[in-house]
């Protein structure tokens, strides 16, 4: 029953989205990164925005208490994300998008085969909402200002004898500002 999985806004100031499974907020849902625990603590409300959609190969959603095998955080369920693999057939993927509300996304994915044993995938993502508006003139922006840089490099070594070695690095930088307009910070309306 997928009706028990919903996406909602958890924070009006930052605009963070949160998954609700079985009616409970995202802090009771465990986010997995290729079956490894991912976002925890203060990053939990932003866990969905830290996973660029163009990087994904698949998503698996599990609901209920039977999912506590992978950790105690998964009271209501788990969301597992699988990323593009170093052995991906597409050598280069570029995606640019700009919405009419000034939100911009840039995604790059490149898979490289380096001989018979080594392969790598380089993933890049930049998203931002740099210019925001206050259409109803209530001294609060309609969306928060934000800028996010996300980079990952994953490697795979596969020997003819069957030995595999997988490793990688991932970096994330996210900056957000509140929804107050500059004039409301000083009491001007």
Language-model regions, residue ranges each:
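Short beta-strands and strand-coil junctions in structured, solvent-facing domains, enriched
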Residues: 6, 28, 38-39, 65-69, ...
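Predominantly transmembrane beta-strands of Gram-negative outer membrane beta-barrel pores used
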Residues: 30, 58-62, 78-84, 91-100, ...
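Outer-membrane beta-barrel domain signature
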Residues: 8, 46, 66-70, 95-98, ...
């Amino acid at each position: 029953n997928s009706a028990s999985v919903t996406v909602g806004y958890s924070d009006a100031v930052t605009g963070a989205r949160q998954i609700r499974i079985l009616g409970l907020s995202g802090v009771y849902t465990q986010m997995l990164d290729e079956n490894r625990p991912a976002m925890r603590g203060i990053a939990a409300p932003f866990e969905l925005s830290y996973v660029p959609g163009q990087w994904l190969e698949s998503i698996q959603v599990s609901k209920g208490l039977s999912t506590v095998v992978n950790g105690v955080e998964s009271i209501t369920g788990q969301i597992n994300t699988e990323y593009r693999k170093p052995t991906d057939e597409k050598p280069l993927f570029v995606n640019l998008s700009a919405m009419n509300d000034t939100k911009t996304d840039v995604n790059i994915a490149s898979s490289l085969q380096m001989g018979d044993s080594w392969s790598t995938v380089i993933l890049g993502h930049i998203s931002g909402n740099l210019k925001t508006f206050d259409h109803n003139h209530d001294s609060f922006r309609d969306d928060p200002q934000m800028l996010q840089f996300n980079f990952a490099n994953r490697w795979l070594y596969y020997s003819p004898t069957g030995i595999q070695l997988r490793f990688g690095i991932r970096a994330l930088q996210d900056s957000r500002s509140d929804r107050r307009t500059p004039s409301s910070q000083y009491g001007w309306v």
